[in-house]
């Protein structure tokens, strides 16, 4: 080799070899010092075929797992079916299931629904019965919706109201007939509803709000019981009493006019006696007030006040 200035040296190669060997020793020592106990050895050579195959299989399994996780249940099922047919043979028709016996939630509720649930019905609850009971609990069971299409045959259909009907006022502020939406002249009726459910005959008292035409349909064969509020009954009683008092006053006035013709002396005496009697009654009532404590008045509870308020609201 040529050195600087064109001079050759016989010791230049030996010096370079010594420096490279020292560097290798230093790197090996540094690697040993920096090596961690769980660290694997570095392969300076080409890996064995078996090791390379294991690494490839592991990487492919990881990718496949991520791919399956990204799928939903249906896509995963179709992939497995296609892989099975691809590797083991067969037809896709063998994997098709018959949908004749499939049931939706609505079918399950129709099969297990009950108009009224008793304690006996809630025994031995299956998932179908639990679903029907959950639907029943969400219904509003104050007023019913009626189907009066077969009223001439004395056949009626009743069901409870759902949330939308309660919000819209159907069955309470509008006619409770399924095919009628009138809101004038509504009357409340109480009907003894007899029905057969799951092979068992049952009865239930049902309240309905119907217009005049639908009330005629309901009472086509025999009249049902009409529900009236307490205040209306009290008003009718008061009206009857007032009319009877008016009649008695008129009759007394007529008799008094007849007696006036007979003589004024007797009328004066009667007036004096009436005035004396009224004065005596007033004095007696005043004396009775101071004899003892005031009579106790029955105070209504909060529940009774709420009941009266809701009766005026609903009827």
UniProtKB/Swiss-Prot annotation:
Domain of life: Eukaryota
This protein's UniProt keywords: Acetylation, Disease variant, Intellectual disability, Nucleus, Phosphoprotein
Name of this protein: Protein FRA10AC1
Compositional bias of kind Basic and acidic residues: 236-245, 268-278
Known role: May be involved in pre-mRNA splicing.
One protein family per Pfam: Fra10Ac1
Implicated disorder: Neurodevelopmental disorder with growth retardation, dysmorphic facies, and corpus callosum abnormalities: An autosomal recessive neurodevelopmental disorder characterized by developmental delay, intellectual disability, and absent speech. Patients have microcephaly, hypoplasia or agenesis of the corpus callosum, growth retardation, and craniofacial dysmorphism.
């Amino acid at each position: 080799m040529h050195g600087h200035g064109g001079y050759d040296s016989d010791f230049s190669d030996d010096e370079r070899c010594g420096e490279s060997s020292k560097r290798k020793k230093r790197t090996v020592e540094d690697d040993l010092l920096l090596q961690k106990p769980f660290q694997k050895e570095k392969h300076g050579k080409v890996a064995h075929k078996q090791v390379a195959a294991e690494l490839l299989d592991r990487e492919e399994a990881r990718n496949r797992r991520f791919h399956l996780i990204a799928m939903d249940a249906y896509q995963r099922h179709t992939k497995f079916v296609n892989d099975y047919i691809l590797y083991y043979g067969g037809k896709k028709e063998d994997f098709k299931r018959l949908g004749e016996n499939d049931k939706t939630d609505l079918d399950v509720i129709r099969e297990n629904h009950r108009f009224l649930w008793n304690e006996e019905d809630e025994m031995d609850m299956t998932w179908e019965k639990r679903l029907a009971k959950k639907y029943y609990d969400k219904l509003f069971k104050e007023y019913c919706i009626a189907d009066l299409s077969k009223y001439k045959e004395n056949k009626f259909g009743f069901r409870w109201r759902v949330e939308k009907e309660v919000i819209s006022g159907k069955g309470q502020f509008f006619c409770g007939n399924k095919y009628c939406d009138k809101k004038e002249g509504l009357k409340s009726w109480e009907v003894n509803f007899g029905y057969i459910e799951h092979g068992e005959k049952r009865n239930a008292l049902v309240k309905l709000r119907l217009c005049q035409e639908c009330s005629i349909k309901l009472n086509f064969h025999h009249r049902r019981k009409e529900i009236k509020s307490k205040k209306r009954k009290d008003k009718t009683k008061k009206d009857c009493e007032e009319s009877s008092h008016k009649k008695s006053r008129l009759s007394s006035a007529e008799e008094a006019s007849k007696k006036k013709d007979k003589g004024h002396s007797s009328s004066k005496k009667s007036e004096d006696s009436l005035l004396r009697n009224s004065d005596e009654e007033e004095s007696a009532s005043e004396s009775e007030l101071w004899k003892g404590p005031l009579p106790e008045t029955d105070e209504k509870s909060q529940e009774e006040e709420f009941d009266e308020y809701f009766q005026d609201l609903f009827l």
